A protein has these predicted regions:
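RNA-binding accessory domains that recognize and position tRNA/RNA substrates
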Residues: 1-177, 187-233, 351-356, 380-384
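ATP-dependent adenylate-handling ligase core
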Residues: 14, 68-78, 111-112, 206-270, ...
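Short glycine/threonine-rich loop-to-helix capping motif typified by GTGT followed
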Residues: 52-56, 250-251, 294-298, 347-359
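Active-site adenylate/phosphate-handling loop in enzymes that bind or generate adenylated species
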Residues: 122-127, 161-173, 244-245, 249-323, ...
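Conserved G/P- and acidic residue-centered "switch" motifs that form tight phosphate/ATP-binding loops
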Residues: 183
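Generic beta-strand/beta-sheet core signal
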Residues: 203-205, 238-241, 282-283, 312, ...
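The feature marks non-catalytic terminal segments
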Residues: 332, 336-384
Length: 384
């Protein structure tokens, strides 16, 4: 009797001729997630089995795999010979002592002498005799015992399903550059896009010494949380202090946020292209803050020359975003009270619906290209 973990995937079976590519990416991502743990991953009949591990590490393996996009459900199972006595011993081990239950059997081995219903009925009856605190409920059971009879002469016995992260394997839908701040929104945006199979790289803008090193460390932690779902990531760190000082010195203060965001988008696009990214990703949510009006988004987006901008949070309210932040494990980090660059020289009344003619007039007061080049020269790259 060996403990194994059954991993079932989400949408890969829909991919037709590309299915092999998606399955290989999925298996590679699971291997990366389990790095440092002795194990073997084997594909079997439209699912994967994790085998050969120290049984004391089964919970850690499930925890790691729960962050791998593409995982639909998992089950910690016992692998036994396709023999009714062996199957019953495994069922007795994984089942509770009391409550309601039913047995569900899937019989891939059509040579087995009993059909699925007969197996479920016999095993269920034997379990009732063995554990007097159990009762059968086929409609709304507290426990569902699964039995999978495989074609290789083994049976997998498990108690229930563990929900995975869902989505598609990271790396199957290209690569994008996430503008990540120290707030709640941007890590959630990156998480949502990664769930659809995109590899996510990050870029962060800081204003040291106006912002402190704790603010930077906070962003590194948030990027590390995201990296747990994306099989690692790269964090690009760019200093924009000189840009803010120039805007503060030469431009109407009401346009500080608008002008700074346009610089960020230009810089992000250039670094994204060099890194092989195919889009930019932001945590903007329509109407959530003053700068995130449609006019503000149009202003910042208009400077991006050739990459699409993905804004996955546009239709979410703040509570929905917070729920997702909590679920991914980023919220407690995001709410630490360290300021980011957007709070430096923040005007009392920032322009909410900027007009393009006014923006261009303010921008004409600046050496845009020179400021961009100076910012890019400060680039630091961290592998997480």
């Amino acid at each position: 009797m060996e403990k194994v973990i059954i991993v079932r995937y989400c949408e890969i079976h829909l991919k037709g001729n590309n299915r092999g590519f998606f399955e290989r990416s999925f298996a590679e991502n699971m291997e990366k997630a389990l790095r440092g743990i002795r194990h073997e991953i084997r594909k079997q009949s439209g699912r994967y089995l994790v085998e050969g591990f120290d049984e004391a590490l089964s919970e850690e393996i499930v925890e790691r795999l729960s962050k791998v996009f593409g995982v639909h459900t998992m089950s910690v199972a016992l692998s036994v010979k396709s023999d009714m006595d062996e199957i019953f011993r495994a069922v007795a081990e994984v089942s509770p002592s009391e409550g309601t239950f039913k047995v569900e059997t899937h019989r891939a081995d059509k040579k087995f002498p009993l059909n699925s219903m007969q197996i479920s009925a016999e095993i269920g009856g034997r379990l009732l005799d063995y554990k007097k605190g159990l009762k059968v409920d086929i409609h709304n059971p507290q426990t569902v015992i699964g039995i999978d009879l495989r074609e290789n002469g083994t049976a997998l016995v498990f108690n229930g399903l563990i929900r995975g992260a869902g989505g598609m394997p990271v790396g199957t839908a290209g690569k994008g550059m996430l503008l990540i701040s120290g707030g709640i929104d941007s890590p959630v945006a990156g998480h949502m896009i990664a769930k659809r199979g995109m590899k996510v790289e990050c870029i962060h803008f800081h204003s040291y010494p106006y912002t402190n090193m704790q603010a930077r460390e906070k962003v590194e932690e948030l990027a590390s949380v995201l990296a747990g779902y994306t099989c690692g990531t790269t964090l690009n760190i760019v200093k924009v202090t000189h840009i803010q000082e120039e805007i503060h010195k030469k431009c109407n203060g009401e346009y500080m946020v608008t002008l700074l965001r346009r610089f960020m988008m230009r810089i992000a696009e250039r670094i994204a292209k060099k890194s092989g990214c195919q889009c930019l990703i932001t945590g903007e949510s329509l109407g959530q803050v003053a700068s995130q009006t449609i006019e503000g988004m149009t202003s910042s987006g208009s400077v991006v020359e050739s990459l699409p901008i993905l804004r996955p949070l546009c239709g979410f309210d703040k509570n929905e975003i917070i729920e997702r932040s909590r679920a991914m494990g980023a919220y407690e980090i995001s709410i630490r009270p360290y300021e980011d660059c957007c709070t430096v020289f923040l005007p009392r009344h920032p322009v909410i619906r900027p007009k393009m003619a006014d923006i261009l007039a303010e921008e004409a007061k600046l050496d845009v290209e020179g400021l961009i080049k100076e910012a890019i020269s400060s680039l630091e790259v961290l592998k997480l």
